[in-house]
Amino acid sequence: MMCGAPSATMPATAETQEVADQVKSQLESKENQKFDVFKAISFKRQIVAGTNLFIKVDVGGDKCVHLRVFQPLPHENKPLTLSSYQTNKERHDELSYF
């Protein structure tokens, strides 16, 4: 993978689900709703001055959200940040940079 270029889409892992779970409350606050279903499906990784994770999350009802989560470098000792997100996505929608 080139620095700065997003990776290919990969199936979600336990680590991906953990990241999604950590920013779930940020999304719920921004959207003013609770998500009973919040299951990571797939992800892409982009190495920058830290890591951007693009995560497709199943939120139930045949709907998905796409999350862009920034993971700072370990020595910065900062929390994960929900940088951006897209709602009203479906499972077949491509996970791309946004």
Curated annotation (Swiss-Prot):
Q: Tell me which Gene3D superfamilies the record gives.
A: 3.10.450.10
Q: Which PROSITE patterns match?
A: CYSTATIN
Q: What keywords does the record list, in alphabetical order?
A: Acetylation, Cytoplasm, Protease inhibitor, Thiol protease inhibitor
The keyword Nuclease appears for this protein = no
Record's GO cellular component, any one? Answer: cytosol
Would you identify the family this protein belongs to, as annotated? Belongs to the cystatin family.
Q: What is this protein called?
A: Cystatin-B
Has the keyword Cytoplasm been applied to this entry?
Answer: yes
